[in-house]
A protein has these predicted regions:
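Short Lys/Arg-enriched alpha/beta "domain-start" segment
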Residues: 1-25
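SF2 helicase/translocase NTPase motor core
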Residues: 19-33, 44-48, 55-89, 98-153
């Protein structure tokens, strides 16, 4: 599998391209240097289909996102972001201090930039929301706005 960032596509050399083209309408088979190659749009939803078929398809965030803020993700954060941007539903039950906040914000920022999401709702204790989430958004994502809503129930 070859990632083609300029074309926003994945190139696959397959024995049975119909396996992919039957599930991904935009997938096209063409010949390159005498070899049939299947070109698939590199988007979160097509990545999920390829993974469900058993391919080790990378998330498009790795080739198309400029990591916001002064940090680049650690390996575990990179894996978390990969999963969050491809799977429509995901729980992150990692331990404290493993970078869940930044991973979530990077995922949201990427999905927002490609038009997949418009808003996010973060539900957590008020103390965590103000200190952790607020500071991370302010420091690493100056392009994002946030509001804190709280109540007695």
């Amino acid at each position: 599998m070859l990632v083609l960032p300029q074309q926003k596509a994945l190139a696959l050399k397959l024995r049975n391209p119909e396996k992919v083209t039957s599930l991904i309408e935009e997938a096209r088979v063409f010949e390159w240097k005498g070899v049939p190659v299947t070109l698939v749009p590199h988007r979160p939803e097509t990545t999920l289909i390829l993974r469900n078929l058993g391919f080790d398809a990378p998330s498009p965030i790795h080739s198309r996102y400029q990591w916001s803020g002064r940090y680049t993700p650690f390996h575990a954060q990179s894996q978390t972001v990969d999963i969050k941007t491809v799977h429509p539903r995901m729980y992150n039950c990692s331990d404290m201090g493993t970078g869940k906040t930044l991973s979530t914000l990077w995922s949201y920022d990427y999905l927002r930039s490609i038009g997949r999401v418009k808003r996010a709702l973060i539900v957590c204790p008020l103390s965590t929301l103000s200190v952790t989430w607020g500071e991370h958004i302010f420091e690493h994502f100056p392009n994002l706005n946030y509001a804190v809503l709280h109540g007695s129930r």
